[in-house]
């Protein structure tokens, strides 16, 4: 039975074909990159369309993965899979240590500074060379209408309360 769409987590994206035997090139959002290959059953999603796929094999190829899906044996057929997000049920993600979070858990949290001012909500995160960056967008009740980029570091993030939907930060609202 397929998993409801709101219970899915995107772990990668099919970006193009690979070779002539129906393999696809995959950009992985997992760390390390080849962790995506641990999941054999994929839910593929693109423009509201959902389909199921089964991974037969895959390998790391530079900064992307080459993957063979069951029943996909032709380059032109593989091309039709380009652009699909690769999703798995949240329940299949491994448990994390205390104080560690998946990005999807942080998205949507209200961001509050030390003075109690609402800066906005975390829209998404960016991976940079030094540290991850939270993109905080204004929301109803926020201090102003500015978008902010905050580092996801121990120095900036003071506390995270998933149940309350809040993150407390040490951040000057003028930045």
From Swiss-Prot:
Q: Which GO terms describe its cellular component?
A: cytoplasm; ribosome
> Is Chaperone one of the keywords UniProt gives this record?
yes
Keywords linked to the UniProt accession:
Chaperone, Cytoplasm, Ribosome biogenesis, rRNA processing
The record's subcellular locations are: Cytoplasm
Taken from the record, one Pfam family name reads: RimM
At the top level of its lineage, which domain of life is listed? Bacteria
Could you provide one GO biological process annotation from this protein's UniProt record? Answer: rRNA processing
PRC barrel domain segment(s): 97-175
**What GO MF terms are annotated?**
ribosome binding
Predominantly, its location class is: cytoplasm
UniProt entry tagged with the keyword rRNA processing: yes
Q: Which family does it belong to?
A: Belongs to the RimM family.
Q: How does it assemble?
A: Binds ribosomal protein uS19.
Written domain comment of the UniProt record:
The PRC barrel domain binds ribosomal protein uS19.
Function statement: An accessory protein needed during the final step in the assembly of 30S ribosomal subunit, possibly for assembly of the head region. Essential for efficient processing of 16S rRNA. May be needed both before and after RbfA during the maturation of 16S rRNA. It has affinity for free ribosomal 30S subunits but not for 70S ribosomes.
What HAMAP family does UniProt report for this protein, alphabetically?
A: Ribosome_mat_RimM
Q: What is this protein called?
A: Ribosome maturation factor RimM
Organism annotation? Pseudomonas aeruginosa (strain LESB58)
Lineage of origin: Bacteria, Pseudomonadati, Pseudomonadota, Gammaproteobacteria, Pseudomonadales
Recorded name of the encoding gene: rimM
